[in-house]
């Protein structure tokens, strides 16, 4: 046998066939993928008083004290005569918070709920929401001139790469496997806050 042929055979022996990936390993690699990690995209805080006027202005002040941002007023979509609500009347105030401040306020709200939510608080799109009865439980000092207001928390989660769906130029859809489902949001809540979910399968 020539030296060239011997070298060729040795190379064949050295090359190993690729090892098959087991389903467990595939699941683990997806879990460890940084692109699969969840984060808070935004937190929306809403106070609905059901009427315009002084009560609504005071509710907006509560949101401003909590977030340091200027709230936006929401209008009624329909006329509800039984509640004296007119269409296009300002009846609620809301503010959108992002970044570290959103995480800080969310943790305060979950602490009021003792880090306990119901399965129905989570949507199939991976968002979740809950409410509290008294805003002073968030650490805001009670002001007799303002009163006490309850508020709703609405949390939108996202993954790295979600912004491509919102681009005006060269936008793209988020792949089905990359989308966030209810189970993803529930697991994120349990892992991040050591939370408890009551009711349902999750």
UniProtKB/Swiss-Prot annotation:
Family the entry assigns: Belongs to the universal ribosomal protein uL5 family.
One Pfam family here: Ribosomal_L5_C
Entry superkingdom: Eukaryota
Subunit record text: Component of the large ribosomal subunit.
GO-annotated biological processes: translation
Keywords from the named record: Cytoplasm, Nucleus, Ribonucleoprotein, Ribosomal protein, RNA-binding, rRNA-binding
GO cellular component: cytosolic large ribosomal subunit; extracellular matrix; nucleus; phagocytic vesicle
InterPro entries attached to this UniProt entry: Ribosomal_uL5 (IPR002132), Ribosomal_uL5_C (IPR031309), Ribosomal_uL5_CS (IPR020929), Ribosomal_uL5_dom_sf (IPR022803), Ribosomal_uL5_N (IPR031310)
Cellular compartment(s): Nucleus; Cytoplasm
Function: Component of the ribosome, a large ribonucleoprotein complex responsible for the synthesis of proteins in the cell. The small ribosomal subunit (SSU) binds messenger RNAs (mRNAs) and translates the encoded message by selecting cognate aminoacyl-transfer RNA (tRNA) molecules. The large subunit (LSU) contains the ribosomal catalytic site termed the peptidyl transferase center (PTC), which catalyzes the formation of peptide bonds, thereby polymerizing the amino acids delivered by tRNAs into a polypeptide chain.
Full protein name: Large ribosomal subunit protein uL5
Keyword Zinc set for record: no
Region described as Disordered: spans on this chain: 1-30
Biased composition (Low complexity): 1-17
GO molecular function list: RNA binding; rRNA binding; structural constituent of ribosome
